[in-house]
Amino acid sequence: ATAGPASGKIRAVIGAVVDVQFEQGELPAILNALTIDQGNNQKLVLEVAQHLGENAVRAIAMDGTEGLVRGQTVVDTGAPISVPVGRGTLGRIINVVGEPIDERGPIECKQRNPIHADPPSFVEQSTEAEVLETGIKVVDLLAPYARGGKIGLFGGAGVGKTVFIQELINNIAKAHGGFSVFTGVGERTREGNDLYREMKETGVINLEGESKVALVFGQMNEPPGARARVALTGLTIAEYFRDEEGQDVLLFVDNIFRFTQAGSEVSALLGRIPSAVGYQPTLATDMGLLQERITTTRKGSVTSVQAVYVPADDLTDPAPATTFAHLDATTVLSRGISELGIYPAVDPLDSKSRLLDVSVVGQEHYDVATGVQQTLQAYKSLQDIIAILGMDELSEQDKLTVERARKIQRFLSQPFAVAEVFTGIEGKLVRLKDTIASFKAVLEGKYDHLPENAFYMVGGIEDVVAKAEKIAAEAN
């Protein structure tokens, strides 16, 4: 072997993919990081994806490939991409290769970990079921989240996934003692900037003292290589807190679909034959390798919340469909509900959770949740009749069901603290026991006399009563 690191020469550049020729016997391993010195302290990192034969490798660039020329020198680092881990990352913004992008100097860390790692073995995993209270009525009641579980937020364009994630950060990360890692994968840079400023204002990020969150970004403007790997960077930082510090970590990923999308952009350039809908043939494997690492072990837990963009509102598209298989709880945001003006636009009949089980949530919660779903389902099946014949043709019992369902539907809406600037309504956080009690009372008909408007955009049932009195006073 040679004394220094092996070096090769660029042979071809095709978009985000670079072919590099090495000397005999100096071939870098798959997933190794290669670097190209671009002058003025700029280094471009590539990751080896394929061996082409004839001592050539095909690598994916983690940044733009503008300005590269054939014959330029490429150095093999001899190891995968590694990123700083530990408390030095808290309060900082990091890119895919672990460099700070917040212009606040280098990151102080004693350790760097490779972004590719094996998932914890089956023996190490923990399987306890415990509900994570979010303070969002529709979630806590109908599709509760698991502490240390995986949660998916599914929705098309513009139905409120990012606002929902921000509300969860607001409700859980603030009340939660441990650390959080927020990973922005292929989403809007503006939203990342807003989030950072908001976290500074609320003290989640403290520039002087100890912060509670590390931010990792590879946004829409980045090349596909960065977007396909930045989720792993964020996960590596979260894994360190889980395994080395025994923490309960919150991992937010916005958006996991962009991870798949970036993989499909690169896949064609790597010469793989596409599978269904043009996705990469390795779609399920890529997703599995990522998702299996996001798990709770005996050392600590990772509770992950992932936003999943649904292309063209089609939940059967291979990308969202593959993601469904990995999750404990799914919150489906629906365009139909957002068009009714009900926010959060959660579909109460489509959202599911593994925890909605008598043995986990208890009999009362289970009965109220199923009662709410039955009422809404009955209303859904009566909607065609109402559309054709009108309300007057329904039986008295059906009329009552419809009235209650419309109240429940409105009562599932809730003002968010993070949306206060847009709505002008103060955000509300509702405790689980209050949610169960108030929906139970609505199902029992105790509030049949109140107008349905009173149930819209409020917190608990006492707010409904107050709003009803206000409506009555205005009417007189």
Curated annotation (Swiss-Prot):
It comes from the Eukaryota. It catalyses: ATP + H2O + 4 H(+)(in) = ADP + phosphate + 5 H(+)(out). Its EC number is 7.1.2.2. ATP binds at G156, A157, G158, V159, G160, K161, T162, V163. The keyword S-adenosyl-L-methionine does not apply. SUPFAM superfamilies: C-terminal domain of alpha and beta subunits of F1 ATP synthase (SSF47917), N-terminal domain of alpha and beta subunits of F1 ATP synthase (SSF50615), P-loop containing nucleoside triphosphate hydrolases (SSF52540). CDD domains: ATP-synt_F1_beta_C, ATP-synt_F1_beta_N, F1-ATPase_beta_CD. It is an enzyme of class 7 (translocase). It is found in: Mitochondrion inner membrane. Its main location: mitochondrion. The record marks S351 as: Required for activity. The keyword Membrane applies. PANTHER family: ATP SYNTHASE, ATP SYNTHASE SUBUNIT BETA, MITOCHONDRIAL. Mitochondrial membrane ATP synthase (F(1)F(0) ATP synthase or Complex V) produces ATP from ADP in the presence of a proton gradient across the membrane which is generated by electron transport complexes of the respiratory chain. F-type ATP synthases consist of two structural domains, F(1) - containing the extramembraneous catalytic core, and F(0) - containing the membrane proton channel, linked together by a central stalk and a peripheral stalk. This is ATP synthase subunit beta, mitochondrial. It comes from Pichia angusta.
